[in-house]
Amino acid sequence: MKIQLIAVGQKMPDWVKVGFEEYQRRFPKDMPFELIEIPAGKRGKNADIKRILEQEGKAMLAAAGKGKVVTLDIPGKPWTTEQLASQLEAWKNDGRDVCLLIGGPEGLSPECKAAAEQSWSLSPLTLPHPMVRVIVAESLYRAWSLTTNHPYHRE
């Protein structure tokens, strides 16, 4: 199983790249973790946000291919570390790649939400999208460490 984090936005600050890559490199070879960046639509005073969301959504779903789509969205289900570890095991048993979608400033398109088999909420707070990349990477690594009795996770 491969995990893909499909996120709207490019040209992230260095701390985002460094933080994400720190956890990305720790994943085992049999569970590669990859970041796919979708260019954000041009936003401005007269931008057609509905059209931009639609274009970003199409690009995200195209990148997901036949993988299991899981959106990161405030109304989603919050998981504890233990619940995320169980999800990780269930995803492995499913046999498909897992595609986690992070939307842009206006969130995810209705098409992405409709395509999602699951929706995960990190917090009821609105989080900066660059920070979400790092939080997701660390959370998934921690969940993996729990499933393999790796000493990274401590109770």
UniProtKB/Swiss-Prot annotation:
Subcellular location: Cytoplasm
GO cellular component labels: cytoplasm
Gene Ontology MF: a single term: rRNA (pseudouridine-N3-)-methyltransferase activity
Classification via InterPro entries: Alpha/beta_knot_MTases (IPR029028), RlmH-like (IPR003742), tRNA_m1G_MTases_N (IPR029026)
EC number: 2.1.1.177
Residue numbers binding S-adenosyl-L-methionine: 72, 103, 122-127
Record bears the keyword S-adenosyl-L-methionine: yes
Family as reported in the entry's similarity comment: Belongs to the RNA methyltransferase RlmH family.
Function: Specifically methylates the pseudouridine at position 1915 (m3Psi1915) in 23S rRNA.
Name the record gives this protein: Ribosomal RNA large subunit methyltransferase H
Species assigned in the record: Actinobacillus pleuropneumoniae serotype 5b (strain L20)
